[in-house]
Design a protein with these regions (language model features):
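Non-catalytic structural scaffold of enzyme domains
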Residues: 1-220
């Protein structure tokens, strides 16, 4: 194995587990940590108790540091927009890491999020580093719940997202950004019905985390 442990923090057991599974496929040992038990609880915390959520997040980071965890992957787009993680006791690789890399390379995009907080995270980053970027956002919480129920293919078909993707092509947008780590599970289906480049933030998060682990901390 390449590393002792990476902590994968996400909104629900599904996406924290998915992130850990993807890291293990790269021979990186990882342990999932969910901030909520379900998408409904996650959305409620983000909407009604963001301060409480932030306290819980930073308390978890403190505990992980005491366990000598060296790196955290924040595998949830909406959570990353709600909790401030610019100054933390552990290094955090998050969706913002990916946004800062890809947005300056694009003039426009269709952003697909699991809730409005995920869209806000992309919009906020674009405003700061690429203010000329044209972003159209679609939030589909029901698709997230369908994926969590165990049948991503059926959930994707029921969402009628394919028609939205075709509309993005007609509008001349440059790319589709999957700003929900749940959507990594349906990335191939999205790519199959869309001619635009698909930027899967979840997969890129895994790539950045694996690269950071292989590089190791300074002085290793």
């Amino acid at each position: 194995m390449i590393a002792d442990k990476v902590a994968v923090i996400a909104g629900t057991p599904y996406d924290s587990g998915l992130g850990a599974e993807l890291l293990r496929a790269h021979e990186v040992t990882a342990r999932p940590y969910a901030m909520a038990d379900s998408p409904d609880e996650q959305d409620s915390l983000q909407d009604q108790a963001p301060g409480q959520l932030a306290v819980s997040f930073h308390r978890l980071l403190d505990q992980l540091r005491q366990q000598r965890v060296e790196l955290t992957m924040l595998f949830c787009n909406s959570l990353s927009s709600v909790v401030n993680h610019d100054d933390t006791v552990l290094p955090v690789i998050s969706p913002q890491t990916v946004y800062r890399e890809v947005l300056p390379q694009l003039r426009s995009s269709l952003v697909l999020g699991g809730n409005a907080h995920a869209l806000l995270g992309v919009e906020r980053t674009a405003r700061l580093i690429s203010p000329g970027h044209r972003m159209l956002g679609v939030s589909d919480p029901m698709l997230v719940r369908g994926i969590e129920n165990g049948d991503p293919a059926t959930a994707f078909a029921a969402s009628q997202l394919a028609s939205t993707l075709r509309r993005a092509e007609q509008l001349g947008l440059e790319a589709v950004i999957l700003a929900c780590t749940h959507f990594t599970a349906i990335g191939p289906a999205i790519a199959a019905c869309c001619q635009l480049p698909v930027i899967d933030v979840g997969s890129l998060l895994v790539e950045r985390t694996v690269a950071a682990i292989r590089k190791g901390p300074p002085g290793r």
